[in-house]
Amino acid sequence: MSKAIVVFSGGQDSTTCLIQALTQYDEVHCVTFDYGQRHRQEIEIAKELSSKLGASSHQVLDVGILNDLTVSALTRDIPIEENKDGNAIPNTFVPGRNILFLTLAGIYAYQINADVIITGVCETDFSGYPDCRNEFIKSMQTALMQGMDKQLTISTPLMWLDKAETWALADKYNSLELVRHQTLTCYNGLKGDGCGTCPACILRQRGLDEYLANSTMYQAQLAAKCTE
């Protein structure tokens, strides 16, 4: 029996990954992390979506210590700054977040004998976060396998997709409207189309507009990438 764990926030990317995973594995278990994020509504949305979509289980883990150790606009009452310098790390970056999340997901995978951890990180539209890059993911996979003496794959279905192609993937599984209206990506905690002004909303909306303007082209691009 194949088992996978989805690192699940209830946002566009992780929900799209969950929808796909449910077609690929016998059991799909979700894990959500409470790290004191400002957009805390995502935790409740993650609970609702994991149940609605049919995940085998859903765990919410308290990692509030991350908020104690780090200072980020995602966890503190700090204005979210626009990252005008593409080489700079934005102030929404939470240092160590994906290191911690993937480590805990790896421990969970060990306990339930799952061989795959799925995360929605993406290098194409990675917002300047160093822990969303493919090089980091491969390093984490190696560290987890060596540290636990277990065969484990960290799967990143969105790694080389842009936001328009991520919308195409949701549409491929007839879930574009669900992802659009029932997920939470907004840094200000607004469901669906969000506030429209934070960096996450701008990136998400631009991708949606591009996809809707030429869905046939993006579906073809998605199909080509999925067969590479």
UniProtKB/Swiss-Prot annotation:
The note on cofactor binding and number reads: Binds 1 zinc ion per subunit.
Q: Which cofactor does it need?
A: Zn(2+)
- Residues at which Zn(2+) binds: 186, 195, 198, 201
Q: Which residues form a coiled coil?
A: none
* SUPFAM superfamilies registered for this protein in UniProt: Adenine nucleotide alpha hydrolases-like (SSF52402)
Q: What is its EC number?
A: 6.3.4.20
Task: Provide the disulphide bond pattern.
Answer: none
The pathway to which it is assigned is:
Purine metabolism; 7-cyano-7-deazaguanine biosynthesis
Protein residues bound to ATP: 8-18
Q: Which Pfam families does the record associate with it?
A: QueC
Q: Which reactions fall under this protein's catalytic activity?
A: 7-carboxy-7-deazaguanine + NH4(+) + ATP = 7-cyano-7-deazaguanine + ADP + phosphate + H2O + H(+)
Query: Which one of the record's GO molecular function terms can you name?
Result: ATP binding
Biological process (GO), any one:
queuosine biosynthetic process
What does the UniProt keyword field contain?
ATP-binding, Ligase, Metal-binding, Nucleotide-binding, Queuosine biosynthesis, Zinc
The reply to whether Nucleotide-binding figures as a keyword in the UniProt entry is: yes
Q: What does this protein do?
A: Catalyzes the ATP-dependent conversion of 7-carboxy-7-deazaguanine (CDG) to 7-cyano-7-deazaguanine (preQ(0)).
Family, similarity comment: Belongs to the QueC family.
> Which protein are we looking at?
7-cyano-7-deazaguanine synthase
* Originating species: Shewanella piezotolerans (strain WP3 / JCM 13877)
